[in-house]
Design a protein with these regions (language model features):
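Acidic/polar active-site rim loop that often engages polyanionic ligands
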Residues: 14, 42, 49
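Conserved radical SAM core fold
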Residues: 45-55, 85-88, 101-123, 140-143, ...
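Canonical Radical SAM [4Fe-4S] cluster-binding loop centered on the CxxxCxxC motif
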Residues: 1-28
């Protein structure tokens, strides 16, 4: 995770510290690249907190990190899990023009639950950013993920999957929401593996090239297998 450990938003599912973040550390891309090299990584997933305090939402540091990894260990593929950059197409273009191997932006939940789950985000804005990523660099696959168990219906989840496909997303992750602490949103349902399997089959039928679905699936789960 780059851009510090303090987030400018207060999503109801997330345990990351909230508040006023520190200044951007421009030596961070070099250190991340050195860590990738030291670990001998062949696939690195880079994510961040939301940085609504910055005009580009932190896009520049994502690009610098991608470039630093490529320069230090060219065999290492990069996947970036980015925030919505407050809907800035220019910010998304900065990231895409650094040529990550996969662009991930999680839709997280169904539109009806956005106010409780993703305070400060908008469903349509996230879809638009995913679509814009494809417009900028159609050769780079896009990815998104959905947490289940927050009160969504099966029909709502399927509609989100269809929306993601309609906006060019090719890689999908579906996982069980797990509550980080008693202060966070409650788990309203534990989704059985059979339902995850059914959604996986549906997703493949919709045209997703790769689907990971199960209670413990997260954004980076088996990420390298999708490319």
């Amino acid at each position: 995770m780059i851009l510090g450990n303090v987030c400018t938003r207060r999503c109801g599912f997330c345990a990351v510290q909230k508040g006023a973040p520190l200044a951007v550390d421009y030596d961070e891309p070099r250190r991340v690249a050195e860590a990738c090299a030291a670990l001998g990584l062949r696939y690195a997933v880079i994510t961040s907190v939301n940085r609504d305090d910055r005009k580009d939402g932190g896009a520049e540091l994502f690009a610098l990190t991608i470039e630093a990894i490529r320069a230090r260990i060219s065999a290492c593929k990069t996947e970036v899990l980015v925030p919505d950059f407050q809907g800035s197409h220019a910010a998304m273009e900065i990231v895409m023009n650094a040529h990550p191997h996969v662009l991930n932006h999680n839709i997280e939940t169904v539109p009806r639950l956005y106010r409780q789950v993703r305070l400060g985000a908008r469903y349509e804005r996230s879809l638009d950013m995913l679509a814009h990523a494809r417009r900028v660099r159609p050769e780079i696959p896009t990815k998104s993920g959905l947490m289940l168990g927050l009160g969504e219906t099966l029909e709502e989840a399927i509609r989100v999957m269809r929306d993601l496909r309609a906006h060019g997303v090719g890689i999908l992750t579906l996982g069980q929401y797990l509550r980080p602490s008693p202060k966070h949103l409650p788990i309203l349902r534990y989704v059985p593996q059979q339902e995850f399997d059914e959604l996986c089959d549906l997703g493949r039928g919709m045209g997703f090239t790769h689907v990971e679905a199960g209670p413990l699936v997260r954004s980076s789960y088996h990420a390298s297998e999708a490319v």
